[in-house]
């Protein structure tokens, strides 16, 4: 497949780079791939097949179930992403720039990626998806369109990225648009799972003083497992008990710091409104 490499005069950020690429492209379909992913064989055929349907304006795929880095944090993060994309609604309300296609006319009608707001990698693709969806563009998720993620995560980079570049800007986006998506990892059971995680955080210190509260802790742990049992079974299959237990703990941590990000984003939104 012929390729053209564009060199920008200065570092302008991920959104600007994608927009310049879209402007230089000549085809009807724009296909975005992150630099740290590898498209699975047959991926382009799936893109062409889905985008040949005139009612589809955009589509995106998923990470595969075999991430490149085998550390617990990296495997948990990538497998959690894989799991939620594999079990979400096929009719989507957002977009994913790591592996996503959009009709050229729809992309430019929506204004492309927001270069002023998102210079660093963040939720620029999600925000574009909101505008596409708000403009009546049909976006579909194809779970079989998969890429292997090559990124290595550690705990510090995971928490910092999820809070600063995801939870906070995502909260601002929700408030600006007046609606919260209900697919992917924002389904109602995931919101309930976050509340269970918070209840665990409160119950465990109390149980250290009052042993009877350990029954409450046990019940909450069962509920926490049940709410994400599919994900934990996937982790067990891919990495054994060590990854399953580590993933369970990381998932509870994810809920807690995401709620902190939600609170911070809400505070920023209301202070801006003053």
Q: Model-found features: residue ranges?
A:
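Conserved nucleotide-sugar donor-binding
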Residues: 26-27, 99-111
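Glycine-rich, basic loop-to-helix element that forms the pyrophosphate-binding segment
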Residues: 8-25, 46
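Membrane-embedded multi-pass helical conduit in multi-pass membrane proteins
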Residues: 195-270
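Short aromatic/hydrophobic "clamp" motif used to bind/position activated sugar donors
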Residues: 30
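Catalytic donor/gating beta->alpha subdomain of glycosyltransferases that bind UDP-sugars
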Residues: 114-182
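Short, flexible, basic/aromatic active-site loop/helix in glycosyltransferases
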Residues: 60-63, 75-94
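Conserved donor NDP-sugar-binding/catalytic core segment of glycosyltransferases
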Residues: 38-73, 150
């Amino acid at each position: 497949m012929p390729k053209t490499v564009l060199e920008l005069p200065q570092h302008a950020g991920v959104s600007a780079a994608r927009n310049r690429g879209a402007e230089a492209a000549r085809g009807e379909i724009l296909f975005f791939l992150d630099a740290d992913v590898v498209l699975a064989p047959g991926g382009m055929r799936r893109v062409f097949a889905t985008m040949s349907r005139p009612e589809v304006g955009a589509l995106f795929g998923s990470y595969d179930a075999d991430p490149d880095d085998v550390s617990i944090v990296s495997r948990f993060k990538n497998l959690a992403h894989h799991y939620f994309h594999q079990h979400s609604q096929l009719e989507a309300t957002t977009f994913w720039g790591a592996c996503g296609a959009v009709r050229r006319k729809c992309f430019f009608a929506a204004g492309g990626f927001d270069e002023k707001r998102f210079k660093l990698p963040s939720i620029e693709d999600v925000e574009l998806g909101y505008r596409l969806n708000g403009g009546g563009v049909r976006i579909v998720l194809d779970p079989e369109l998969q890429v292997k993620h090559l990124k290595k995560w550690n705990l510090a980079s995971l928490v910092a990225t999820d809070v600063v570049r995801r939870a906070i800007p995502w909260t601002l986006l929700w408030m600006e648009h007046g609606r919260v998506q209900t697919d992917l990892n924002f389904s109602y059971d995931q919101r309930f799972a976050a509340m269970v995680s918070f209840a665990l955080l409160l119950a465990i210190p109390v149980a250290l003083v009052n042993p009877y509260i350990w029954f409450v802790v046990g019940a909450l742990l069962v509920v926490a497992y049940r709410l994400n049992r599919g994900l934990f079974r996937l982790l067990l299959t891919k990495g054994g008990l060590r990854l399953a237990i580590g993933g369970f703990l990381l998932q509870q941590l994810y809920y807690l710091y995401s709620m902190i990000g939600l609170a911070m984003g809400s505070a920023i939104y209301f202070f801006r409104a003053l």
